[in-house]
């Protein structure tokens, strides 16, 4: 078999259109040669062949292997041979047929790979959920599962504390779990081409984040806490509804009598003690939120007005951020007295449409 070698520590058998059976004897011979050699095999490249399983010769023959590339094959499972590669740091298995039961070897979380594997690329496969064993690979720095069929991100993603790059674009994910914010080293987060409708404010805790890709989702706004991502250099939002759908669906329900009474107590600073009210009312009064409008000074509890406010970010972005106000009067300046109520109501929809279009041009679309 012809070999394209970039160095004594690498075997490059890419695009040879050979099967696992054809590779067996070659790998066994190489393993035998390496047992007495000074330099161990570090990189084995087997992409774009006709592999349906990992070659059995991998088992025990290459203990110092650091990189294994089996992308572009027809693998339906990564067999137990993988567990013998105790020094493996990078595993590339994109564009295969992985994703069914038994796709990953049993005992993966208890194997030496849990401590050695740093880069794992399983993009372009058929995973519908993140395998639990992957969430135990505590040394992972890069995890790629783009172009699969993932429906959600499990809360256990927070176990991957060393993760620096997470690529989950091109799936069917609807929600971002708040636990994602517990990854202190995360620099790159790619969640584009999914079905995400909102961004949890907890993401503002990702203080190391430099790049955030959210394009081609269903976002209508961003939480204002995103302004705390002071190291963010790249933000992609193109292909999202952003403000348009939010404005169309905006509704306001009047406060209940309970909330009106509680607002009065707070605004007028009416004093009370724990002996004056039952516990549930004391807790309710303690849940008041201050209206962010500096000219208002009011409070709200359960009932509020949602408002999109465009804020400059990093000196070059205009982001639509969500604000919560105590009443509709806080959401816009008073109308001019020179306009009649009829003409004002007739022009409202046109004004809102033009303002929204004007603002949308200033939003970063990636």
From Swiss-Prot:
Database matches in Gene3D superfamilies: Ribonuclease Inhibitor
Region entry Disordered, spans: 337-356
PROSITE patterns reported in the protein's UniProt record: LRR (PS51450)
Keywords: Leucine-rich repeat, Phosphoprotein, Repeat
InterPro entries: Leu-rich_rpt, Leu-rich_rpt_typical-subtyp, LRR-SigEffector_domain, LRR_dom_sf
Coiled coil: none
Disulfide bonds: none
SUPFAM superfamilies: L domain-like
Modified residue annotations for Phosphoserine: 19
Skewed-composition ranges (Low complexity): 337-346
Start-end of each LRR repeat: 40-61, 64-86, 87-108, 116-138, 139-161, 162-184, 185-206, 208-229, 231-251
Entry-linked Pfam families: LRR_8
Protein name stated in the entry: Leucine-rich repeat-containing protein 58
Gene for this chain: Lrrc58
């Amino acid at each position: 078999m012809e070999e394209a070698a970039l160095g004594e520590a690498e075997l490059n058998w890419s695009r040879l259109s050979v099967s696992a059976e054809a590779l067996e004897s070659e790998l066994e011979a190489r393993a035998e040669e390496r047992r007495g050699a000074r330099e161990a095999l570090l990189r084995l490249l087997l992409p774009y062949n006709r592999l349906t399983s990992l070659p059995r010769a991998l088992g025990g023959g290459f203990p110092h292997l650091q990189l294994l590339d089996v992308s572009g094959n027809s693998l339906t499972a990564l067999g137990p041979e993988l567990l013998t590669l105790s020094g493996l740091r990078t595993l590339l298995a994109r564009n295969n047929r992985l994703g069914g039961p038994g796709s990953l070897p049993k005992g993966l979380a208890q194997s030496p790979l849990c401590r050695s594997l740093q880069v794992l690329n399983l993009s372009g496969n058929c995973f519908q959920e993140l395998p639990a064993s992957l969430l135990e690979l505590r040394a992972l720095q890069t995890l790629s599962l783009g172009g699969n069929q993932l429906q959600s991100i499990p809360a256990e993603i927070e176990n991957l504390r060393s993760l620096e790059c997470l690529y989950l674009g091109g799936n069917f994910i609807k929600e971002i779990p708040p636990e994602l914010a517990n990854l202190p080293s995360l620099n790159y987060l790619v969640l584009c081409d999914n079905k995400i409708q909102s961004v949890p404010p907890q993401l503002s805790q990702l203080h190391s984040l430099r790049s955030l890709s959210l394009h081609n989702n269903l976002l209508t706004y961003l939480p204002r806490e995103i302004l705390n991502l002071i190291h963010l250099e790249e933000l992609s939002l193109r292909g999202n509804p952003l403000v348009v759908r939010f404005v169309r669906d905006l509704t306001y329900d009047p406060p209940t009598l309970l909330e009106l009474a509680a607002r009065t107590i707070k605004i007028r600073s009416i004093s009370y003690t724990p002996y004056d009210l039952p516990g549930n009312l004391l807790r309710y009064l303690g849940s008041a939120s201050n209206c962010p409008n500096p000219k208002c000074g009011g409070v709200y509890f359960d009932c509020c007005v949602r408002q999109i406010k465009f804020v400059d970010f990093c000196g070059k972005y205009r982001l639509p951020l969500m604000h919560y106000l105590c009443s509709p009067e806080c959401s816009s300046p008073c109308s001019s007295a020179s306009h009649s109520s009829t003409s004002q109501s007739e022009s409202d929809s046109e004004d809102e449409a033009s303002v929204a279009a004007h603002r949308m041009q200033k939003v970063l679309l990636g």
